[in-house]
Amino acid sequence: MRMNDGGSPPPRIGLVLGGGALKGLAHIGALKALEEARITPALYAGTSIGAMLAAAAASGMTSAQMTERARRFRRKDLFRINHVGMIMERMQSPSIYLESPLRALSDELVAEGTFDDLRVPLLVTAVDLENGMPVVFGRPGLRDVRVRDAVYASCALPGFFPPGVVGNRMCIDGGTTDNLPVNIAGQNVDALIAIDVGIADVPAASGIASQGFATIFMRAAAMMMHNQQQFALENWTTPPMLLVRPRVSHISWFSFAHKEELIKIGYESTKDALRDLDTMLAAKGGIYPRRAVHVVVDRVACTGCGLCVARRPDVMALDEFGKAYPLKPKCDFSPADGAFVRSCPVNAIKAQPVIADEETIRAATGEYAAVIA
């Protein structure tokens, strides 16, 4: 919660931490920024590493304690090859890596007990491997299970780690169906703060096929999750949401060499976005921060494929020559509104910041990039 100066009840703010493998260390910086702003979430929700750190926060761990643990975090603390399984069971082995290191990490960060034992409500997403349906641990009927078991299951990336047993369910990584669980967290709160470190964008890359199984798998998974997530965000209504997207696309999913950088990026991105917190809290819905941009189309490059119109018919249309044009050249963009620009197959669409004063100049040089990233 965030205290109001006027003495009125503080708004109930839910915090959502998305999945993103080791990029999720940026969540630690985000939590630090929230602590400094004296924002205490009324509810936590998370997927994968976001679930682990959300559970740690709900267990009472501070960002400083998380930072200290992250600095000691080594590759062998997470990845130990399942040699026996790979040799003896071959294709029937459940995973490349052993369960025990990930399980030990979950046990270290998350308090013992069930969801009813936590000081703050927590929602952890996973997927039931047998029926293919998403599961939200912490919801009524799914609270009497060990939080550590739910967190492990939410982090159990298929093929990398064995599925986790939670109660009588066999579960895998929640990011398989919902990498940023804003929909499940948006109930019974007045506003949301969502930290998306995983799949805000899938930047163009070359040579992927030669970089091995893990790189190919994670890129394919990122494409799938990006499209699922973008649909949810483009259709978002209520409650109002502050969407923070730290710029971490240049860092690989499993890099141990950028821990401090990730924490710093998460901190700075969240601190910057929090300048719009009061505006977001005063709104009835929508996604923030919002910035004015000009949408410009290169008519020579435009092929008239209509993809931009299909994605954003409220913003784009085709003229009598079959070329795309903006219905409103000046638009009010949130971090979730740039997908139709990036999806243009010939890069004919640009969204340029409206430069009007010092504030928008600053946005153009830094914040604007984060808004449409």
Predicted regions and their residues:
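Residues immediately within or flanking Cys/His clusters that coordinate Zn2+
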Residues: 299-305, 334, 338-341
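Patatin-like phospholipase
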Residues: 1-47, 55-310, 348-351, 371-373
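Secondary-structure transition/turn motif
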Residues: 140-141, 328-332, 365
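Iron-sulfur cluster-binding cysteine motifs and their immediate structural context
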Residues: 307-321, 339-356
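Iron-sulfur (Fe-S) cluster-binding modules
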Residues: 350, 356-373
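Ferredoxin-type iron-sulfur electron-transfer modules in oxidoreductases and energy-metabolism complexes
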Residues: 321-331, 338
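Extended beta-strand/beta-hairpin segments
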Residues: 319-323, 367-370
